[in-house]
Every structure is written in structure tokens, then in C-alpha cells.
Amino acid sequence: TNIEAVASDPSNPVEGQVWYNTTSNTVKGVVNNPGSWSTSGNMTTGRRDLAGAGTQTAALGFGGQTSPGTISALTETYNGTSWTEVNDLNNARQYLGGDGVQTSALAFGGSNPPITNVNQKTESWNGSNWTNVNDLGTGRRLLAGAGATNTAMLAFGGDPGIANTENWNGTNWTEVNDLNLGRHDLAGAGTNTAALAFGGTPGTPRQIDTELWNGTNWTEVSDLNVGHRECSGCGTQTSAIVMGKDLLAELWNGTNWTVTADMNVPRARPGGAGANNTSALAFGGESPGTFNSSENFNSGPTTVTFDVS
């Protein structure tokens, strides 16, 4: 079989395609990567119990706990290589919910010492600053969120075992239909009209339940393979990933969960960002010390260089 010779790599190669790059004198091709983690840039300040938004190459991390009893308002952006500190939250907090993109995100709920001091505060991020907006109807911590922008968000779950769900329209929160299973320390993905809720506690030892939100109601769908709590999630209702508290990670394809490659570092309550189950970022967390490290997850068609020596 003849291998195509090209001066530069094809712009849109497909799985199984092989070529010879005459500029680099290498044989390359596209293979399927079932899933792998790689080290990425360190955050400027290590912390746990933070929230995240955005994608693998344009992420936002905010809030959290830097050390026992020290709650953070810090916000950082990630550009695919390095983290940069930007303007703080107005209200320092940990165990908060959040989602959106790097230029349009929402932070809500959480707690401050003592740990039982939950709050209802909501803040909107416009890419430069956080602005206080209308509060959640029910203050809580250890909740999850799903949303694409700071004008459309879903908040659900919370401690202790709360099933409450609220929808944000850019101005106010409105209570909508509850989760079927009340829980906290869960994760979420998707938007306020097409969301996914998974994992959490209470349960022995961790919940495997997954629920799908259609804009009106929650419906139980296929379970996780392994119970997850103190975890993070990102993606869409049909393409999501769950990561933490341990090394374990799983991928959702819209119907079922599949166990994928272990994380490099076991991290509890990390921040997460990602567009789908082929591209994600996990950052911060603790096990038991607080981390500033982050790592990338990638799967699917990947260009590799073949050793033909």
C-alpha cells in the first residue's frame, strides 16, 4: 500500500489514515485513543472544594478552600497552557456550585466557616468581573450546576441530601421539579434545559444514580459503573465525564457510562471543565493535601508518529 507524502499534516485526518510528512521526515497516522490523562499547567494557588466552568483550553476556576478554615475568593483563568489570577469573587466560599464558559459563568451557593453556614449568594461573571445578583431560593452547599452562560443555569442537590432544583433565567431563580434522589457531593453536566446529574451521597458508600433533565422533569437513566462522590463533571447531556474523588473516571455517551483511564492523581472535590467526553480538564482538589496541579483528559481519534526504525 502506498503512503501519501505531504509537506504538512492533513487538516482533517480520519481514523486509520496514514501519511509521510516530508518536512519532518516522519510517518504519521490517526489512531483511536480510548482515553488518557496528561499533566497540564499548575494553578497559581492550590485549593479544593472549588467550582469550574469552560473548556479544556479556556477554563475558569473559582472559590474553594486553600487550607483548613481558609476560604478563598480567588478566580483563575486557564488558556490551555497556564493559569492566570484574575478578579476575585465578591464572596469567598467553598462547596459552591458553578458552570458556564470562561467569559460568562455563574457562581452560587456554598458555605463559609463554620461549615454549617450555608449561603444563597449568586454571582455573575462577564469575563472580567463578578457581580452580585439575586440569591438562590434555598441556600445550600455541596450542590451541582449545569449551564452554558450566566443567563441560563440549573442548580440541583445539596447538603444534606437535598433534591431541590432551581432554574436561573439571568435575573431570578425559580424552583422547579425536584431530583428523584436527594443528594449532595454530586456532579452535573449540560444546560438548564438538557442536564445530567450523577453520583453523590448519602449512600453506602457512594451513589451510582444518574438522572436526566429535559427542562421540566428528572428521569432516572443508566447508573454509573462505580459510585462517585466528591467528584466533578462536565460536558453535555449526551457526552459527559465524571472524575474524582479517587483515580476513577467514567464517560457518558447519552445512554451508558463506560469506565475509562484512571486519573494521574486521586483528587477529591476538584474543579472541572470540558465540552464533552473527549476533552476535559481536572484541577485542584485534595488527597489529603490541597493540590495546585491540573490534568487533561483526551480520547477519540489522535494523530501519532510511528516508529519505523
Residue spans for each PLM region:
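Polar, enzyme-active/binding microenvironments
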Residues: 1-309
